[in-house]
Amino acid sequence: MKERRGKTAAVKQALEHINATLGTDLVLMTDADALFESDTIANLLKWFSDPSIGCVGATPKRIGQRVEEEGHRSMFSMVRNLESKMDSTPFLEGSCMVWRAEAMDSSALHVTSNADDAQIATNVRIHGLRVIQDSSVYFIDHAPHERKEHSRQKVRRAQGLQRHLLRQKKHWFNRRHGRFAPILRQEAALHILTPLMLVGALIAMLARWASIGFAEIDFTNATLTTLHVGLFTAEMVLLASWFTVRYGLRIPLLNQVGTVIDGNLQLIRALWKSARGSSLHMWDQHQDGRN
């Protein structure tokens, strides 16, 4: 590649070369810093004895991950496994995934967007074969230690998935895809609608506090007082839960809630960058946690 155009463009060029010269049945994609267990590849390849399987991905084991990354990755993998059992998952980890070459149309890759792994996984399923994540097969990679690098990585990945899901909207209600269509709708709701709802909730919270500060609220009204106290308590619990993951405090239950909030904040940032026309499909790899 003569000039830097982003990872997806590089993946597309590599796939075109493979299809033109090698004629292989299966394609394995990984990252330069990903480590495999001794039986990772062999266990992934076993799945292809089933002709309905088009793509299989391994489950990540992260080294040095922050509290929010640990919580996010646990929930992310759980959802991938559930989707795999229902039908197929639209998202896999590009650090270790294998697919049938004939099931993937490389021309469908959008080179000005990232999430190349999700693009490949979804394309294979749309062509009729199942896409699954194997919960018992692992790869190992490094997660950023610093909050700044963690957030930068999450926002970039979030934007890629959001843009990918929006491009798939014609498949959200396509009955030909069976149970995969509801999965796409669910992921679109989680990655696009939910963060927008959080923005609405934040605006409503600020408006409520403004009304308390500038309007004459009758706190002798027991019902109104109970409502405000209840909302204040809920807001403080949610804020405290976010602080636990923001500053690496391990507190059960609060960490899980904080992980969800933190993830949606990254999704909001990704939506904002997209709204401003900022594309994150080209980036500098984080060095934090790799040395």
PLM ranges: what are they?
Residues 223-247:
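A C-terminal functional module that forms or caps the active site or interfaces directly
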Residues 48-76, 111-116, 120-187, 259-265, ...:
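Catalytic donor/gating beta->alpha subdomain of glycosyltransferases that bind UDP-sugars
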Residues 8-18, 24-25, 30, 38-113, ...:
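Long helical/loop segments within the catalytic core of UDP-sugar-dependent glycosyltransferases
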Residues 210-213, 244-248:
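Juxtamembrane "helix-exit" motif on the non-cytosolic side of transmembrane helices
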Residues 34, 90, 97, 118, ...:
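Residues that recognize and position ribonucleotide moieties
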Residues 149, 153-229, 253-256, 275-291:
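Basic/Trp-rich segment in TM-proximal cytosolic loops or flexible interdomain/linker regions
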Residues 2-3, 24, 32-34, 116:
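Short acidic donor-binding/metal-coordinating loop in glycosyltransferase active sites
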